[in-house]
From Swiss-Prot:
Hydrolase recorded as keyword: yes
Bilayer topology: Peripheral membrane protein
Record bears the keyword Transcription regulation: no
MF (Gene Ontology): GTP binding; GTPase activity; ribosome binding; translation elongation factor activity
Primary location: membrane
Pfam families: EFG_C, GTP_EFTU, GTP_EFTU_D2, LepA_C
SUPFAM superfamilies: EF-G C-terminal domain-like, P-loop containing nucleoside triphosphate hydrolases, Translation proteins
Encoding gene (name): lepA
Protein name: Elongation factor 4
HAMAP family given in the database record: LepA (MF_00071)
GO CC, one annotated term: plasma membrane
InterPro entries, per database record: EF-4 (IPR006297), EFG_III/V (IPR035647), EFG_V-like (IPR000640), EFTu-like_2 (IPR004161), G_TR_CS (IPR031157), LepA_C_sf (IPR038363), LepA_CTD (IPR013842), LepA_IV (IPR035654)
GO biological process: positive regulation of translation
């Protein structure tokens, strides 16, 4: 091992949402003098306004700190800040691959949560040295010993050296830094070997093109060097190298073991995929870094501008977003009801919310979003397999041999008193119980297989409400399973409205159709003629509601007199309404599309 690297430590921080990860990062930066008190602002590494507001970390960030340890040596610490949310699990695994150690932050008042566990298992898979920290000990409800036991029982880590700390009050920060220096191993790697580096994040800078965050494992990268990206064999010339300390500054080279920024004439962020391997074009390394995969979106929804004139603006906004987010996909789509728009793909629900919120906030767009749907796998009668992300594209019933839907394995951590309510919720969502184990006397871990389509709507909100906010959820994709699914069409006056169709389980179709029709009846305004709202599977109508017509009294000016005169007027009115119904089109208000989303309740 090169003696050169013995002063470098690469580590990340693992924590559940709100356990104080970003605050701890702020304190570490202040303690090492990387950021002066004047520059410090809360959640220093969460650059996006949205990240600060929701208190979550979305993109990975890095920062290099200089630290003089108690043994008098100077160390270079690279903190790689990872997103904690399960939607970004792949980004987390790539950030972990770039480290040798991790600080595990556990809230002294809450104990170990589902996402903490999921990330810890990933860290253990990457053989990281884990330094446990029990945070928020300044709170009156903190139970340090209890949490220490829980870390030992639930995760199986030896927690006798766990550092009690309070990131908010700055207690225990020095001790954490000492532990990093003494427990996390220095990186290995030979600066003379062929170049091998992993990209663990990339984003688009309007002046320099794509900026890649990399960790160099072998070799050295210098400006003017020709590099090659492994997954697509494209070659680029390195223009500049840099590090964040915490503001960007240029460096002359990055050697094995170091973490930094590479800018190399890359124009498209989709070329610099997270997890890809960079090597020297002239002297490539033997094998790429294992575990690279192209992230596939799991949840889809249509996004349409309310004003048709905003279409171009929406397209520009989506293009800019996708520059920074290689997991986000979009393609144009048209809908009879909503006009022109885009079909967007996301990693999960949080990702979807964030993208939509950024479109509305950063680009000031007013949007309609259709109900989220998942990717179904359809095998038709000829045996061809096709993946469908939009219910409107489903082939007719008689051509489908089998339909499969994605299933998730969900791990739910909860208090023992909420178990009943949670099991009931999972049962309602067609879940299949796999495991239930008690962690100590107060907490329980429940494992279920649940179809993704059932989780997409509001499973998370419901879970939080039945457990009074105490349950936490972590999930991974298990694979596709065959299910008895049907496409439910909504017809208005006999015309199908594509944006309202949904794919549902056959057992639920009747109930769902009835609910939908009732909802729509409330939101579609009255017309001069009656409007029929029907829910149908194929040609079979399973539910119907009618919006009654306005009634105009055409007989008001007939006093007494002959019945035939009155009949003539009534017939004439009836004719008029019939003609109107043939040519009239029903305006479907924005609320109708939202009604589809709310039907679940």
């Amino acid at each position: 091992m090169a003696e050169k690297n013995s002063h470098i430590r690469n580590f990340s921080i693992i924590a559940h949402i709100d356990h104080g990860k970003s605050t701890l990062a702020d304190r570490l930066l202040e303690h090492t003098g990387t950021v002066t008190k004047r520059e410090a602002q809360a959640q220093f590494l969460d650059n996006m306004e949205l990240e600060r507001e929701r208190g979550i970390t979305i993109k990975a960030q890095t920062v290099r700190m200089k630290y003089r340890a108690q043994d008098g040596r100077d160390y270079e610490l690279n903190l790689i800040d990872t997103p904690g949310h399960v939607d970004f699990a792949y980004e987390v695994s790539r950030s972990m691959a770039a480290c040798e150690g991790a600080i595990l932050v556990v809230d002294a008042t809450q104990g170990v949560e589902a996402q903490t566990l999921a990330n810890v298992y990933q860290a253990l898979d990457h053989d990281l040295e884990i330094v446990p920290v029990i945070n928020k000990i300044d709170l009156p409800s903190a139970d340090v010993e209890g949490v220490r036991q829980e870390i030992e029982e639930v995760i199986g880590l030896d927690a006798k050296d766990a550092v009690p700390a309070s990131a908010k009050e700055g207690i225990g920060i020095g001790e954490i830094l000492e532990q990093i220096v003494h427990r996390v191993p220095p990186p290995e790697g030979d600066p003379e070997a062929p170049l091998k580096a992993i990209v663990f994040d990339s984003w688009y800078d309007s002046y320099r093109g794509v900026v890649m965050l990399v960790r160099v494992f072998e070799g050295t990268v210098r400006p003017k060097q020709k590099i090659r990206l492994w997954s697509n064999r494209k070659e680029f010339e390195v223009q500049e190298l840099g590090i964040f300390a915490p503001f960007a500054k240029a460096v002359g080279e990055l050697q094995a073991g170091e973490v930094g920024v590479v800018v190399a004439n890359v124009k498209d962020v989709h070329d610099a995929k997270v997890g890809d391997t960079i090597t020297d074009a002239a002297r490539p390394t033997e094998a790429p870094f294992p575990g690279f995969k192209v992230v596939k979106p799991m949840v889809f929804s249509g996004v349409f501008p309310i004003e048709a004139a905003d279409y171009e603006q929406l397209r520009d906004a989506l293009e800019k977003l996708s520059l920074n987010d290689s997991a986000f996909t979009y393609e144009p789509e048209t809908s009879q009801a909503l006009g022109f728009g885009f079909r967007c793909g996301y990693l999960g629900l949080l990702h979807m919310e964030i993208v939509q919120e950024r479109l509305e906030r950063e680009y000031q767009l007013a949007l309609i979003t259709t109900a989220p749907s998942v990717v179904y796998r359809v095998t038709d009668t000829t045996g061809a397999v096709e993946e469908i992300d939009n219910p409107a594209k489903l082939p007719p019933v008689q051509k489908i041999a089998k339909l499969e839907e994605p299933h998730l394995t969900c791990h739910i951590h909860a208090r023992t008193e909420d178990v009943g309510a949670i099991l009931k919720l999972c049962q309602e969502r067609r879940g299949l119980q796999r495991d239930l184990k008690y962690l100590g006397t107060k907490r329980v871990q429940i494992t279920y297989d649940i179809p993704l389509a059932e989780v997409v709507f509001d499973f998370f909100d419901k879970l939080k409400s039945v457990s009074r906010g105490y349950a936490s959820l972590d999930y991974e994709l298990k694979g596709y399973e065959e299910a008895d699914l049907v496409k439910l069409d909504i017809l208005i006056n006999g015309e199908p409205v594509d944006a309202l169709s949904v794919i549902v389980h056959r057992e639920r179709a009747y109930q769902r159709g009835r609910d939908l029709c009732q909802r729509l009846r409330e939101v579609i305004p009255k017309q001069m003629y009656e409007v029929a709202i029907q829910a149908a599977i194929g040609a079979k109508v399973i539910a119907r509601e009618t919006v009654k017509a306005f009634r105009k009294n055409v007989l008001a000016k007939c006093y007494g007199g002959d019945i035939s005169r009155k009949r003539k007027l009534l017939e004439k009115q009836k004719e008029g309404k019939k003609r109107m119904k043939q040519v009239g089109s029903v305006e479907i208000p924005q609320e109708a599309f939202l009604a589809v989303l709310k039907v679940e309740e």
